[in-house]
Protein backbone atom coordinates (compact mmCIF):
# COMPACT_ATOMS: atom_id res chain seq x y z
CA UNK A 1 0.00 0.00 0.00
CA UNK A 2 1.31 3.44 -0.91
CA UNK A 3 1.97 5.77 2.03
CA UNK A 4 -0.65 8.21 0.78
CA UNK A 5 -3.33 5.48 0.75
CA UNK A 6 -2.33 4.48 4.28
CA UNK A 7 -2.58 8.13 5.32
CA UNK A 8 -6.10 8.40 3.89
CA UNK A 9 -7.14 5.14 5.56
CA UNK A 10 -5.73 6.32 8.90
CA UNK A 11 -7.41 9.73 8.78
CA UNK A 12 -10.72 8.98 7.05
CA UNK A 13 -12.59 8.26 10.28
CA UNK A 14 -11.31 11.40 12.01
CA UNK A 15 -13.61 14.32 12.65
CA UNK A 16 -13.20 17.71 11.06
CA UNK A 17 -10.27 19.83 12.24
CA UNK A 18 -10.85 22.05 15.26
CA UNK A 19 -10.29 25.25 13.29
CA UNK A 20 -13.06 24.36 10.82
CA UNK A 21 -15.46 23.45 13.65
CA UNK A 22 -14.58 26.73 15.39
CA UNK A 23 -15.21 28.63 12.16
CA UNK A 24 -18.66 27.08 11.64
CA UNK A 25 -19.80 27.12 15.28
CA UNK A 26 -18.26 30.28 16.74
CA UNK A 27 -18.09 32.61 13.75
CA UNK A 28 -21.51 31.35 12.65
CA UNK A 29 -20.83 31.14 8.94
CA UNK A 30 -23.18 28.47 7.69
CA UNK A 31 -23.33 28.73 3.94
CA UNK A 32 -21.53 29.83 0.85
CA UNK A 33 -19.01 28.59 -1.65
CA UNK A 34 -15.95 26.91 -0.12
CA UNK A 35 -12.79 25.38 -1.51
CA UNK A 36 -10.77 22.87 0.47
CA UNK A 37 -7.18 22.60 -0.70
CA UNK A 38 -5.37 19.31 -0.11
CA UNK A 39 -8.64 17.75 1.03
CA UNK A 40 -7.13 14.32 1.72
CA UNK A 41 -9.73 11.99 3.23
CA UNK A 42 -12.26 14.83 3.08
CA UNK A 43 -13.14 15.25 6.75
CA UNK A 44 -13.37 19.04 6.54
CA UNK A 45 -15.21 18.87 3.22
CA UNK A 46 -17.84 16.51 4.65
CA UNK A 47 -18.26 18.67 7.76
CA UNK A 48 -18.73 21.84 5.72
CA UNK A 49 -21.26 20.18 3.40
CA UNK A 50 -23.21 18.87 6.38
CA UNK A 51 -23.27 22.50 7.58
CA UNK A 52 -24.81 23.73 4.31
CA UNK A 53 -21.67 24.80 2.40
CA UNK A 54 -21.10 24.06 -1.28
CA UNK A 55 -17.58 22.65 -1.45
CA UNK A 56 -15.05 22.20 -4.20
CA UNK A 57 -12.53 19.74 -2.78
CA UNK A 58 -9.10 19.77 -4.43
CA UNK A 59 -6.35 17.19 -4.02
CA UNK A 60 -3.48 15.86 -6.11
CA UNK A 61 -4.77 12.31 -5.53
CA UNK A 62 -8.05 10.79 -6.74
CA UNK A 63 -10.03 10.88 -3.48
CA UNK A 64 -13.45 11.77 -4.88
CA UNK A 65 -15.02 8.36 -4.15
CA UNK A 66 -13.68 8.33 -0.57
CA UNK A 67 -15.52 11.57 0.10
CA UNK A 68 -18.67 10.93 -1.96
CA UNK A 69 -19.47 7.67 -0.12
CA UNK A 70 -19.84 9.69 3.11
CA UNK A 71 -22.53 11.97 1.67
CA UNK A 72 -26.23 11.37 1.00
CA UNK A 73 -27.82 12.31 -2.34
CA UNK A 74 -28.82 15.81 -1.23
CA UNK A 75 -25.33 16.46 0.15
CA UNK A 76 -23.71 15.16 -3.03
CA UNK A 77 -25.30 18.08 -4.89
CA UNK A 78 -23.11 20.40 -2.79
CA UNK A 79 -19.91 18.48 -3.54
CA UNK A 80 -17.47 18.86 -6.42
CA UNK A 81 -13.99 17.41 -6.73
CA UNK A 82 -10.99 18.49 -8.77
CA UNK A 83 -7.76 16.52 -9.06
CA UNK A 84 -5.00 19.09 -9.30
CA UNK A 85 -1.59 19.92 -7.86
CA UNK A 86 -0.55 23.30 -6.50
CA UNK A 87 1.65 24.19 -9.46
CA UNK A 88 -1.26 24.20 -11.92
CA UNK A 89 -3.95 25.35 -9.50
CA UNK A 90 -6.70 27.64 -10.76
CA UNK A 91 -9.15 28.88 -8.15
CA UNK A 92 -12.66 30.22 -8.64
CA UNK A 93 -14.02 33.04 -6.49
CA UNK A 94 -15.17 31.80 -3.10
CA UNK A 95 -16.35 32.72 0.40
CA UNK A 96 -13.98 30.34 2.16
CA UNK A 97 -10.65 28.62 1.60
CA UNK A 98 -9.77 25.76 3.94
CA UNK A 99 -6.11 24.73 3.77
CA UNK A 100 -5.17 22.42 6.64
CA UNK A 101 -1.80 20.66 6.55
CA UNK A 102 -1.36 21.17 2.82
CA UNK A 103 0.25 24.54 2.04
CA UNK A 104 3.61 23.54 3.56
CA UNK A 105 3.80 20.81 0.90
CA UNK A 106 3.85 23.42 -1.84
CA UNK A 107 7.37 23.76 -3.19
CA UNK A 108 8.86 26.85 -1.55
CA UNK A 109 9.76 28.24 -4.99
CA UNK A 110 6.06 28.21 -5.98
CA UNK A 111 4.52 29.29 -2.68
CA UNK A 112 4.28 33.03 -3.39
CA UNK A 113 2.40 32.41 -6.64
CA UNK A 114 0.08 29.94 -4.90
CA UNK A 115 -0.61 32.37 -2.06
CA UNK A 116 -1.44 35.14 -4.55
CA UNK A 117 -3.98 32.83 -6.22
CA UNK A 118 -5.53 32.01 -2.83
CA UNK A 119 -5.67 35.66 -1.80
CA UNK A 120 -7.16 36.76 -5.13
CA UNK A 121 -9.83 34.03 -5.05
CA UNK A 122 -11.32 34.93 -1.66
CA UNK A 123 -14.16 37.43 -1.98
CA UNK A 124 -14.47 40.49 0.27
CA UNK A 125 -15.75 39.33 3.68
CA UNK A 126 -14.68 35.78 2.78
CA UNK A 127 -12.49 33.68 5.04
CA UNK A 128 -9.27 31.71 5.16
CA UNK A 129 -9.05 28.80 7.62
CA UNK A 130 -5.81 26.84 7.62
CA UNK A 131 -2.27 26.47 8.79
CA UNK A 132 1.41 26.80 7.96
CA UNK A 133 4.52 25.07 9.26
CA UNK A 134 7.05 27.12 11.21
CA UNK A 135 10.83 27.00 11.08
CA UNK A 136 11.08 24.79 14.17
CA UNK A 137 9.11 21.98 12.52
CA UNK A 138 11.12 18.76 12.39
CA UNK A 139 10.55 18.30 8.67
CA UNK A 140 12.43 21.52 7.87
CA UNK A 141 15.74 19.68 8.29
CA UNK A 142 14.79 16.82 5.95
CA UNK A 143 12.32 18.22 3.41
CA UNK A 144 14.08 21.21 1.88
CA UNK A 145 11.57 21.68 -0.95
CA UNK A 146 8.66 22.31 1.46
CA UNK A 147 7.51 25.75 2.64
CA UNK A 148 8.31 26.78 6.22
CA UNK A 149 7.57 30.30 7.47
CA UNK A 150 8.34 32.57 10.40
CA UNK A 151 5.53 34.07 12.46
CA UNK A 152 6.21 37.44 10.81
CA UNK A 153 5.99 35.92 7.33
CA UNK A 154 2.63 34.32 8.13
CA UNK A 155 1.23 37.58 9.51
CA UNK A 156 2.46 39.43 6.40
CA UNK A 157 0.46 37.01 4.20
CA UNK A 158 -2.70 38.34 5.84
CA UNK A 159 -2.19 42.06 5.24
CA UNK A 160 -5.47 42.10 3.26
CA UNK A 161 -7.32 40.32 6.07
CA UNK A 162 -8.54 40.84 9.61
CA UNK A 163 -6.95 38.04 11.65
CA UNK A 164 -9.62 36.50 13.88
CA UNK A 165 -7.60 33.63 15.35
CA UNK A 166 -3.85 33.15 15.31
CA UNK A 167 -2.35 30.29 17.30
CA UNK A 168 1.23 29.11 17.28
CA UNK A 169 1.59 25.49 18.36
CA UNK A 170 4.84 23.70 19.01
CA UNK A 171 4.60 20.11 20.25
CA UNK A 172 5.57 16.51 19.66
CA UNK A 173 2.87 14.38 18.09
CA UNK A 174 2.07 11.78 15.48
CA UNK A 175 1.65 12.17 11.73
CA UNK A 176 -1.23 10.69 9.75
CA UNK A 177 1.04 7.69 9.19
CA UNK A 178 1.46 7.18 12.94
CA UNK A 179 5.08 8.39 13.13
CA UNK A 180 6.27 10.75 15.87
CA UNK A 181 7.61 14.17 14.92
CA UNK A 182 8.07 17.68 16.31
CA UNK A 183 5.37 20.00 14.97
CA UNK A 184 5.60 23.78 14.64
CA UNK A 185 2.32 25.11 13.29
CA UNK A 186 0.64 28.48 12.81
CA UNK A 187 -3.16 28.12 12.77
CA UNK A 188 -4.98 31.05 11.18
CA UNK A 189 -8.59 32.11 10.75
CA UNK A 190 -8.87 35.40 8.89
CA UNK A 191 -11.53 37.51 7.17
CA UNK A 192 -10.81 39.30 3.89
CA UNK A 193 -11.16 43.08 4.10
Task: Show which residues each predicted segment covers.
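Class I (Rossmann-like) S-adenosyl-L-methionine-dependent methyltransferase catalytic domain
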Residues: 1-31, 35, 40-90, 109-113, ...
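A conserved beta-strand element that flanks and buttresses the S-adenosyl-L-methionine
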Residues: 98
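Short catalytic micro-motifs in class I SAM-dependent methyltransferases
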Residues: 101-102
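ABC ATPase nucleotide-binding domain "signature" loop
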Residues: 105
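A short glycine-rich, Lys/Arg-flanked "PGG" loop and its adjoining helix->strand segment in the class I
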Residues: 112-124
Amino acid sequence: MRDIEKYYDNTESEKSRNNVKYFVNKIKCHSGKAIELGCGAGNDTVYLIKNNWNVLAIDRESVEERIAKRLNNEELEKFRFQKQNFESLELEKNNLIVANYCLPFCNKNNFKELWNKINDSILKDGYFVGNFFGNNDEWKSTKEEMTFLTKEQVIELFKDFEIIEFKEVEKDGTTGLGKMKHWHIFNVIAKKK
